[in-house]
A protein has these predicted regions:
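N-terminal targeting signals for Sec/Tat export/insertion, comprising classic cleavable signal peptides
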Residues: 30-56, 60
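Cleavable N-terminal export/targeting peptides
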Residues: 1-25
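Outer-membrane beta-barrel translocator domains and adjoining extracellular loop/strand segments
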Residues: 41-48, 85-93, 133-145, 185-194
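Short, conserved structural micro-motifs that define repeat-unit consensus positions
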Residues: 63-67, 172-174
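Predominantly the C-terminal beta-signal and adjacent terminal strand-loop region
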Residues: 83-87, 98, 168-214
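Gram-negative (and chloroplast) outer-membrane scaffold detector with strong preference
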Residues: 22-26, 35, 39, 65-139, ...
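A charged, solvent-exposed segment within the mature domains of Sec-exported extracytoplasmic proteins
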Residues: 122-174
Length: 214
């Protein structure tokens, strides 16, 4: 009798595990707080040894994925617009400008483990397109004679890793990280002279939140 009960319990657990799985044909939606932390560098500006520096920002991050097989998925990363202060040590100016950007990123991912696993770590690689908007110099920048800021959009490679842990048949918690190659050219004027500066933003993106599969 005890052996029978144990067998039934094991089968119940296995059935529950299968129900909890990410599996072929599932759509996966994730949401959470996403922090963009630039690993930035730039050419020298205005003939000095100083660089432009892009500050971090945190917004709502969203992803939508589709399980092509039990182990392979396609995912799109989106977010509400990120807003970044741009600063420089040139002349002790500090923050001189700001910009907003959206970073849609398209990933192909591999999930480790079996379809019935509640814990699914994954890695991925793909491509990012970042477009900048509402860029401009603030009062400090304008006071220093700077104007007409324009940032070129960027195409670059991306890599990520993450892990999902199923709470029940549909809901799970998630933690993930991306490294994104973002390079832009900043065009601007100092007085009447035009300048261009290459800026490598190359951010780490950290997201923690939850998700739903259907």
């Amino acid at each position: 009798m005890n052996k029978t009960l144990c067998g039934v319990a094991v089968l119940a657990i296995l059935a529950s595990g299968n129900a909890l799985a990410h599996k072929e044909g599932d759509f996966i939606v994730r949401g959470g707080l996403a922090a963009v932390v630039p690993n930035d560098s730039s050419d020298d500006i205005l003939g000095s040894s100083d660089e432009l520096e892009v500050k971090s920002d945190t917004q709502l991050g969203l992803t939508l994925g589709y399980m092509i097989t039990d182990n392979i998925s396609f995912e799109v990363l989106a977010a509400t617009p990120f807003s970044h202060d741009i600063k420089t040590d040139l002349g002790g100016l500090g923050t001189i400008a700001d910009t907003k950007h959206l970073p849609p990123t398209f990933m192909l991912q591999y999930y480790f483990g079996q379809a019935e696993s509640k814990l699914r770590p994954y890695v991925g690689a793909g491509i990012n397109y970042t477009f900048f908007f509402d860029e401009g110099f603030n009062g400090t920048g304008k006071g220093a004679g700077l104007s007409d800021l324009d940032l070129d959009d960027s195409w670059g490679l991306a890599a990520n890793a993450g892990v999902d842990y199923m709470l029940n048949d549909d809901w799970f918690v998630n933690a993930s990280v991306w490294y994104i190659d973002i390079e832009t050219e900043a065009s601007y004027k100092a007085g009447t002279t035009k300048y261009k500066t290459d800026v490598d933003i190359d951010p780490w993106v950290f997201m923690i939140g939850g998700g739903y599969k259907f």
